Structures are given as structure tokens and as C-alpha cells.
Regions:
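Positively charged, low-complexity intrinsically disordered leader regions
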Residues: 1-38
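Well-ordered alpha-helical segments embedded in enzymatic catalytic cores
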Residues: 33-40, 94, 185-188
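Short strand-loop junctions, especially beta-strand C-caps/beta-turns
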Residues: 21, 26, 56-60, 130, ...
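Generic structural signal for well-ordered alpha-helical scaffold segments
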Residues: 39-46, 96, 100, 190-197
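Gly/Ser/Thr-enriched, mixed-charge loops and adjacent short helices
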Residues: 2-11, 32, 119-230
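Glycine-rich phosphate/diphosphate-binding loop of Rossmann-like nucleotide-binding domains
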Residues: 31-44, 48, 56-69, 74-76, ...
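Ferredoxin-reductase
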Residues: 48-134
């Protein structure tokens, strides 16, 4: 695997908050903007060589392109395995559960929450640590300091991962597993709620309306409300 070291110059606006770095899509589309921020994250972490990184997002515009960049950079920086949701999809709570369930080192969640998406909308990248929660301030502060001085980032020359195909692929020498974005989370919900009782409620004639217009809610609603409870 040939690792490429690409020269870059810092951007002055890459200060993450507790919800990561949220900017307009047009900002993220600037040359090396995504790469600078991802490299700053990796440079601020220790002990991940050969470890697992979870990647997924809410499916908004620019999600796929950023995920392909993140996969190649994860390989170049020494991760041994990436778990990515099919279609590049993982809701924030599902990503948190996948991180914990698979004992991953951490994860990249690509979302701007309720902010509007689209080419003229918003995009975001957030790093979650091994317990599934957001990176603490000591990490986000370190990331910001690194973004101010970054002059190179690492990547590899590799084809895009087929995000729609569940199964194992490779990016360079790194294993990439495309997983069902809903399965682990739906199984978790069955341990937290009495699905038999909820099924009985629906069978009794109970009806409800569910608004799945926000972010990535739809696939989870289909799997849980229709397939498991309907």
C-alpha cells in the first residue's frame, strides 16, 4: 500500500464544538478542507494503529464523497478496519451503538443534525470516542490547534468502496466492512423496550402517525415500526 503525503495549508475556521464541525457544504467543498480536518482528528489521537473505525452519516448531500475520503485517509493513517453503514448511512445513536457493540476505537459521524441539507445547505463531521459519545473538550481543543498548523495529510490511491454492497472489501491493506445500518440498533431497541407489548397494542387497533422527515429516521422507522412491530 503506497501512502501519499499531500501538502496543504491551514484553514482558520475549523474549530469543532460538541456537535463537531458544521459548515456550509460549499465550505467543505473547498480544496483539502475535509482532508485537513480529518487529518487533524487523526493527529490528535493515539493508539489506534490496527484498530476499528466506524463511519456513517445521515445521507445528506456530500455524505458519500466525504466518506470515501475518510476511508482512504483512515487506511493511510493506520486503522486496520472500517465499519461503514450501507449507503454511507448511520444515525447518530446507531453509530454510537455500533462503536460500543463492535468495540471500535471511535467513529466519524457525518451529520449536521436538523440543519437543512443540499448543495446550498449544511454539512458536518463529528468524532465520537470508544464509548460512543462525543469527543471530550481535550480532544476537540487538540483538533482545533492542529488545524491551525497542519501542512500535510495522508491518503492512499485506491478505488471507491462500493457502499451499497453489504460485505467485506478492502481499501489498500485496510479491511472495509459495509454493514446493515439498522440491524444492530434495532436489536438494541428490542432489549430496551417490550416489543411484544407494543405489537399487541398495534394489533388491538391502535393507530399512530410518524413523521420521518428528519435526517436519517426513515430506514429505522421501516425496520422497527413496520418490519418488527407492524
Amino acid at each position: 500500500m503506497m501512502i501519499q503525503t499531500i501538502k496543504t495549508t491551514p484553514y482558520g475556521d475549523q474549530k469543532p464544538g460538541t456537535s463537531g464541525l458544521r459548515k456550509r457544504v460549499t465550505v467543505y467543498q473547498q480544496p483539502h478542507y475535509v482532508e485537513n480536518y480529518l487529518q487533524a482528528i487523526f493527529d490528535s489521537l493515539e493508539g489506534f494503529d490496527g484498530q476499528t473505525l466506524v463511519i456513517g452519516g445521515d445521507g445528506r448531500f456530500y455524505n458519500d464523497a466525504a466518506i470515501q475520503t475518510a476511508i482512504r485517509m483512515a487506511a493511510a493513517n493506520g486503522f486496520g478496519r472500517v465499519l461503514v453503514g450501507q449507503g454511507g448511512l448511520l444515525s447518530t445513536p446507531a453509530a454510537s451503538h455500533v462503536i460500543r457493540h463492535h468495540k471500535a476505537f471511535g467513529g466519524l459521524v457525518l451529520s449536521a443534525s436538523h440543519n437543512p441539507g443540499g448543495p446550498d445547505g449544511d454539512f458536518g463531521i463529528k468524532y465520537n470516542i470508544g464509548n460512543g459519545g462525543p469527543a471530550p473538550e481535550r480532544i476537540t481543543d487538540a483538533v482545533y490547534e492542529r488545524t491551525k498548523v497542519i501542512d500535510t495529510y495522508k491518503t492512499i490511491d485506491a478505488p471507491d468502496v462500493a457502499l451499497d454492497q453489504i460485505g467485506t472489501q478492502h481499501s489498500g491493506e485496510m479491511v472495509v466492512e459495509v454493514i446493515d445500518p439498522v440491524a444492530d440498533y434495532a436489536a438494541l431497541m428490542e432489549t430496551l423496550f417490550d416489543f411484544d407489548a407494543i405489537r399487541a397494542l398495534f394489533a388491538s387497533g391502535f393507530r399512530m402517525t410518524f413523521d420521518a422527515m428528519n435526517a436519517i429516521t426513515g430506514p429505522y422507522a421501516h425496520a422497527i415500526l413496520e418490519d418488527k412491530l407492524g
